[in-house]
Design a protein with these regions (language model features):
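Active-site/ligand-binding-proximal alpha/beta "capping" segment
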Residues: 143
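Extended, charged catalytic domains and RNA/DNA-binding interfaces, predominantly
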Residues: 1-140, 151-160
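Single conserved hydrophobic/aromatic residue that forms the stacking wall/gate
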Residues: 161-170
């Protein structure tokens, strides 16, 4: 499957009608930020310097989440801040995706998702696509990351996904 994705919604500007224009051009998934904050949401890069512009989604970002749902464009949560991800998984009426993230419990990297985030994505019905990039899998340099490291992340996420969620226990 090949899909057109937007790896940073910043170019959409401040005019929400641009969501439709991106959809008309074939965009089928969008990340509201990338390696920096956008007008829609904070990025996970804020962990490095402790900065946040919106404390998650901006008001414009909340509006765009609704429009992305309306047009059937998937919301990619691989780059936004933890608070942005929480808000997106709560606001989105459709499942979100993490198009290239791994398990933070196995590799503490801001781009990886922690157990709490994994549960939010699970509750939302979302999908996590792990990444095979070595620096997301391990901080080990010698030997470098390998297929076992990659599979460990997949196994970990699958185990968490098949465990009862807090909602299932009530």
């Amino acid at each position: 499957v090949i899909m057109i994705g937007v790896e940073n919604a910043y170019p959409m500007g401040l005019n929400t009608s641009n969501v439709r224009k991106f959809w008309e051009r074939g965009a089928r998934y969008v990340s509201l930020s990338h390696n920096g904050h956008s007008q829609f949401t904070d990025s996970n890069t804020g962990e490095f310097d402790g900065t946040a512009l919106h404390n998650g989604l901006s008001d414009l970002g909340k509006e765009v989440v609704e429009l992305l749902n309306y047009y059937g464009i998937m919301i990619d949560i691989s780059h936004p801040s933890k608070e942005g991800i929480r808000q997106m998984t709560e606001l989105s009426k459709a499942p979100v995706i993490a198009s290239h993230s791994s398990a933070r419990a196995l590799r503490d990297h801001p781009r990886n998702v922690d157990d709490e985030q994994l549960n939010w994505i699970k509750e939302n019905g979302g999908v996590i696509q792990t990444t095979a990039l070595g620096f997301f899998l391990t901080d080990r340099e010698d030997p470098p990351a390998n297929m076992d490291d990659f599979m460990d992340h997949i196994d970990y996420i699958c185990l968490l996904y098949t465990s009862p969620s807090p909602r299932d226990l009530h």
